[in-house]
Regions:
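Non-globular targeting/processing and membrane-anchoring segments
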Residues: 1-24, 41-47, 51, 58-164
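Short His-Asn-centered micro-motif
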Residues: 28-34, 39, 55-56
């Protein structure tokens, strides 16, 4: 989630597995560079219940290779997904995994970026099984927030029960 000046929020952030994960001693959280107050109203609008934290004012996102400053971008290439990437934006997708041991120490154990993240997008998983596949002109060009599809009522959510 970038600062709302750009008014952009990734449409893929909709997690329904949190309860299952919690019973496996796993916590799923999202981290955004924007100040917390800038994305809490959006979180409520989407009906999202996962923990969402702000890294505003810290280097957290840069430390894990998903945020880049203007000087890095002006150089023509940034290190993203463990390789030089000439067409990166200021914010790029990524997921990192951490382990907290019984002593309370936290260890970074895994990160995935770009195409390594599509396994987390169940819509893509289902589309990949179909004859037309993803049927995209550009990556995720078809994806909308759940309340921005013409046929969806404003109260609809990707995890709500459909009425028949």
């Amino acid at each position: 989630f970038v600062p709302l000046v750009q008014n952009l929020v990734c449409q893929t952030i909709s997690y329904g597995a949190n309860r299952h994960l919690a019973h496996h001693d796993v916590s799923l959280v999202a981290v955004s560079r924007a100040p917390l107050e800038e994305f809490q109203a959006f979180r409520r609008r989407m009906g999202w219940r996962f923990d969402w934290y702000s890294s505003y004012g810290s280097d957290f996102n840069r430390d894990f290779g998903v945020s880049f400053d203007k000087a890095q971008l002006a150089a023509g290439s940034v290190d993203y997904n463990y390789q030089p990437t000439p067409d990166a934006g200021e914010e790029m997708p990524g997921a990192s995994v951490f382990l907290r041991n019984p002593a309370g120490e936290v260890f970074h154990t895994y990160s995935a970026y770009a195409r390594g993240l599509d396994i987390l997008l169940t819509t893509y998983t289902f589309l990949d099984l179909t004859p037309k596949g993803r049927n995209e002109d550009a990556i995720m060009d078809w994806l909308r927030h759940h309340d921005r599809y013409d046929e969806a009522p404003k109260s609809a959510c990707c995890h709500a029960q459909a009425s028949h």
